[in-house]
Amino acid sequence: MKNIKKPYVILNAAMTIDGKISSKEGDSEISDEEDWKEVHKLRTQVDAIIVGKNTILKDNPKLHIKFYEHNGYYRIIIDSKLSIPIDSQVITYKPETYPTIICATENVLQEKVQEFEARNVKVIKNGKSSSVDLKKLMLNLYNLGIRSVLLEGGGNLNWSF
């Protein structure tokens, strides 16, 4: 087997029997408490969790671990234009335990990068078009020592991998 320099990716997605991940109204609460405990257990077993910017904009999650002992992990946000609010919980909640990395395109304004870096957020810039180059990103993450990631969507991001 050849040495592949990218993290192992695990997809976690709750969906209905007909393959939907949210209702027409956008409600994505499909999971029950037992499901959430399993998600948090999975989070204890990876080096990073990846979500897209829409998850942050819609839910403002902490992306932390409850129910289990752990050492923390990286929170990785795919946000080509650095458009999430600087005061999002993913940035402000326990950054020493859950450091945040935002992946943007090379076109993003340096002032925006500096704004996030001032909050101890690492910004990785790759992708010359309007979207982040996910193949390059995987190599970037591997080079940071990240060997496993839990992909928690949303839908567009899930299908991009």
Language model features: what each stretch is:
Residues 2-144, 156-159:
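Active-site ligand-binding patch in enzyme domains
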